[in-house]
Amino acid sequence: MQVKAEARYIRVSPQKARLVVDLIRGQQAGKALTTLRTTNKRIAPTVEKVLQSAIANATNRNENVDVDQLFVTEAYVNEGPRMKRVRPAPMGRAYRYQRRLAHIVIKVTEKEA
């Protein structure tokens, strides 16, 4: 049984979020939580919340699920919409820049013993 959790419109560059998500793909859920707690990146606590949500979704859907047998089968980051912003520049001009948003998706599956 595959269970999904996602966080949408997270204010982080998808490229930076992928660095953290790539660390936990394929890991056992408990080990992935430990990895995220020790990772020194700004997005790591957010990814940890998404993973905890996926684990909670699995236990809510099926009370017989063994949390120790849950594995991260899919974890990916998609690009969200971009917020366009303006920075004041010299001589009355303005420079445009974009703030990137990300959608984080984590799927966990119970591995058969």
Swiss-Prot record:
UniProt family annotation: Belongs to the universal ribosomal protein uL22 family.
Keyword rRNA-binding appears in the UniProt entry: yes
UniProt keyword Transcription regulation present: no
Pfam family, one: Ribosomal_L22
Name of this chain's protein: Large ribosomal subunit protein uL22
Any single GO CC term annotated in Swiss-Prot or TrEMBL for this entry: cytosolic large ribosomal subunit
Keywords recorded for this protein, A-Z: Ribonucleoprotein, Ribosomal protein, RNA-binding, rRNA-binding
PANTHER family assigned to the protein according to its UniProt record, in alphabetical order: CHLOROPLAST 50S RIBOSOMAL PROTEIN L22-RELATED, LARGE RIBOSOMAL SUBUNIT PROTEIN UL22M
Functional description taken from the UniProt entry: This protein binds specifically to 23S rRNA; its binding is stimulated by other ribosomal proteins, e.g. L4, L17, and L20. It is important during the early stages of 50S assembly. It makes multiple contacts with different domains of the 23S rRNA in the assembled 50S subunit and ribosome.
Gene3D superfamilies: Ribosomal protein L22/L17 (3.90.470.10)
One of the protein's GO biological processes: translation
Subunit structure: Part of the 50S ribosomal subunit.
One Gene Ontology MF term: rRNA binding
